């Protein structure tokens, strides 16, 4: 029987105090891992997060304020980790930030570069700096992506572009780190019920899903995402590297006009 025990592992999750990031941390913590969660100033309730870990019987997480776009913050973060760990075994690059772009006039080069700085480059820079600080790369690097570079979502242009670059870098990073024993993979999530989803697409989207006869079953819960990432780092999928996998309850395959028409006929 296979038992997942990660009590001797250190897991770093950026943007780890809410949504997918927090759910990922809780999944690893539940398996016994020492979890490090980063956040930006004022973006987390530390007591509530610690309580969530305690309820699972998980080790208390290390919460560190660190902006992924600042190398100085990253160095300070790794110094904090070094106080209790000899390295980072799993790195989950989860932070994403972008300006909404409803119209072409909203495209600004500076805003796009800022999106890359937050949503794409940290996967590369953190991996490099972890090696510099600890003398070894993580065993697993997982980047959180979305299907926005293959499907159109209104005002999602910059996010989609940054995720496309992220996925390309992940594939190449997997080749560069293969001889180091590091697996690099990307998880594309479908619609996830999080605050950031509502901020991007609006609160009424769930009303639309209800009218379409889809409802909550179309959404992933953050916990579904955390379990998928944990599975990639469990050792059972070590034959996979440089892969982009989709976790979306199969919605992308079914989401088309003919399926909408069929549901309309059945009303």
State where each predicted segment sits.
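Conserved glycine-rich cofactor-binding loop
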Residues: 17-19
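Conserved mid-core segment of classical short-chain dehydrogenase/reductases
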Residues: 75, 96-115, 132, 155-158, ...
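Conserved glycine-rich Rossmann-like NAD(P)H-binding loop of the short-chain dehydrogenase/reductase
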Residues: 31-48
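Alpha-helical segment proximal to the catalytic Tyr-Lys
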Residues: 132, 175-176, 238
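C-terminal helical subdomain
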Residues: 186, 204-250
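Catalytic Tyr-X3-Lys loop
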Residues: 105-124, 142, 166
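Short C-terminal tail/terminal secondary-structure segment
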Residues: 2, 241-267
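Catalytic loop of short-chain dehydrogenase/reductase
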Residues: 97, 115, 137-179, 191-192
